Design a protein with these regions (language model features):
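SF2 helicase/translocase NTPase motor core
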Residues: 1-150, 184-186
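Helical "lid/switch" subdomain of P-loop NTPase nucleotide-binding domains
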Residues: 137-147, 161, 165-169, 180
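PAPS/PAP-binding and catalytic site of the sulfotransferase fold
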Residues: 37, 69, 165-176
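Conserved helicase ATPase motor motifs in RecA-like P-loop NTPase domains
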Residues: 27-29, 151-166, 174
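Interdomain motor-coupling "hinge/lid" segment immediately C-terminal to the ATP-binding subdomain
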Residues: 159-160, 174-186
Length: 186
């Protein structure tokens, strides 16, 4: 299918390209995924600034939505995806498979960090549903924070940036900007 972006989608894609640390707040159905994939396509294929992309998402979104979106659009043909889903053995095989984009359920981030150890291979990370990383005590937050210095580009996506308190804002942005704006409290 041919992708004809709206102006705001074009702006979103360019924003991701221009800003290695970005948070995208767009409502449901506004095209966060396609805008982000278009930026990834440009960064991987045209600018050669990114080698391996990791998408962290709810399990169904990681398994179904991102691969389907990648296969849906003509301009993304040729980008490859490997969903890191299933048993530990299946996840290990998927993580070791050659691909441009890897998708994983957020509950498996501690496993992935342990699996790769000091050889973290993903130079770009996309957190689909950034608001799910608001608890700095959660294992997934701690694991991602551990490898954050090895990540060159990070994008947080959400349609619902609705914090219950100021502390709910801190953790997601600690991951995005590595504590530059709101501090490194945890």
């Amino acid at each position: 299918m041919k992708y004809i972006p709206h102006d705001y989608q074009r702006h979103t894609t360019q924003f991701i390209i221009d800003h290695p640390e970005s948070a995208i707040f767009l409502g449901m159905g506004m095209g966060k995924t396609i805008s982000t994939l278009t930026a990834v396509n440009d960064l991987v294929r045209n600018r050669f600034e990114t080698q391996k992309v990791l998408v962290i998402a709810p399990i169904r979104v990681a398994r179904d939505t991102w691969p389907a979106e990648l296969n849906k659009w003509d301009h993304l043909a040729g980008l490859t995806v490997s969903p890191i889903i299933g048993t530990a053995k299946q996840r290990q095989a998927a993580a070791n498979r050659r691909a441009d984009i890897y998708t994983i359920g957020r509950e498996n981030i501690p496993w992935l960090v342990k699996h790769h150890g000091n050889r973290w291979p993903y130079d770009m990370v996309i957190i689909d549903e950034l608001s799910s990383f608001k608890n700095p005590q959660a294992k997934r937050f701690k694991a991602l924070k551990k490898v954050r210095p090895k990540i060159d580009r990070i994008v947080g996506l959400t349609g619902t940036p609705a914090p219950n308190s100021l502390l709910d804002i801190w953790a997601p942005f600690r991951l995005i900007d590595n504590g530059q704006r709101l501090g490194k409290w945890a």
